[in-house]
Amino acid sequence: MNKNTWIIGFTLFAMFFGAGNLIFPTQLGLESGHFFWPAILAFALTGIGLPLLGVVVGALDKHGYIGSFNKISPRFSLIFLIIIYLTIGPLFAIPRTASTSFEMSVTPIAQNSGNLALFIFTVIYFLIVLYLCLNPNKMIDRIGSLLTPLLLITIVAMIIKGFVDFSGHSSNYGMTNAYHSNLSGFSQGFTQGYLTMDAIASIAFSMIVVNAIKTTGIQHADKIFKQTIIAGLIAAIALVFIYISLGYIGNHINIPSDTLKELKAKDQNIGTYLLTTMATKGFGTFGKYLLGIIVSLACLTTACGLIVSVSEYFHRILPKIPYKVFVIFFILVSFILANQGLNSVIKMSVPVLSVIYPVAITVILLILIARFIPTKRIAQQIPLIIVAIESILSLITTQGWIRISFIDDLPLKEYSLEWFPIAVVATLVGYMISYFVKQSNIVYQKE
């Protein structure tokens, strides 16, 4: 394993590690109580396992997901990738990184921070993103060898101090009845990890990893696949360590019930409160600044990864427009949306994400199956169409636009996984139908 693989692995970690990856495991630790271990391990399984799988599957074809999706349908490839890149890019995730950085780094320090402060912060934030992203090859090196070590050092410093301050406390009793057994703890952790939606980002980040590996001189798909697995494992190990550590500390922070009630009444994020408590307990007033640095670095690296992946994709389908033009354009769009505030960005994006997320996971699994089982195009098309229809109907019901009664009765609906049994059945039906259809089997390009 050479130096480049380590740099790519650490870059992948940094791109995946956003502010939510700090908040979710810490809050899970508090809520799970005595059932922490099954909850956090299940959280890691879906919160890390699915994104890692998404990155690795993207390396099965020499041309990444573009090549794999084209085998399903060139039209599907174009439409679905445009939706994914715009949704997790300038229309949602990138503006959210800036808004989250502001709310967790500036707001706690400057009590009266308003629209002007947000404007100034986002100008500086996106100028840094612009500098890092204008050259995508240098971006990998800058993040992997500079920003990631700085991010890891600050996180580890807070974790070590957190262990010293809180590990002597007894495990709390949890704050919700959802955790009442090892099985319920596992199912809750599994669902929370799934709901991070990092698997969608893996489709975008996979292209960066594949292209970065190609720049080292590796061109054969099998070797690219092997290096992608190694880089993915490096990122996964770092994420597992941080998730379990933050979750463990959160599990040993005892918050009075009155404080919890007050937080809920104010609709304040409990995970953010726990992180602030951990930072200020360990480092006093400086803790607020330390947490701000950690969150800003985490969000900055994620924003860079998304800007590069989105810009590279659109430059690929519209080669007459230079890559740098796309970078500037998407940063401007993200800047405008970031100044609408965090809550506005989230409200706009959640409905779209709830539709494309099941389709994204389904297509990742279908491509993986096709790697080992002879598969015709129609065997992938049928389950994708059915899952997309179910996801749209589920959204319509959830939003209250039209009441579709059978949607609420679907298995696993309470875990937001009602699409999964449907995907399994549709896949089996698709493979059965494919036996009667004259199509050649899908072959992923290696040379």
Swiss-Prot record:
Please provide, alphabetically and separated by semicolons, the GO molecular function terms listed in this UniProt record: L-isoleucine transmembrane transporter activity; L-leucine transmembrane transporter activity; L-valine transmembrane transporter activity
Pfam families from the UniProt entry: Branch_AA_trans
In the record, biological process GO terms are: isoleucine transport; L-leucine transport
Q: How does it sit in the membrane?
A: Multi-pass membrane protein
Cellular location(s)? Cell membrane
Q: From which domain of life does this come?
A: Bacteria
Chief site of localization: membrane
Sorted alphabetically, the Gene Ontology cellular component annotations on this record are: plasma membrane
NCBIfam families per record:
livcs
Q: What is this protein called?
A: Putative branched-chain amino acid carrier protein SE_1090
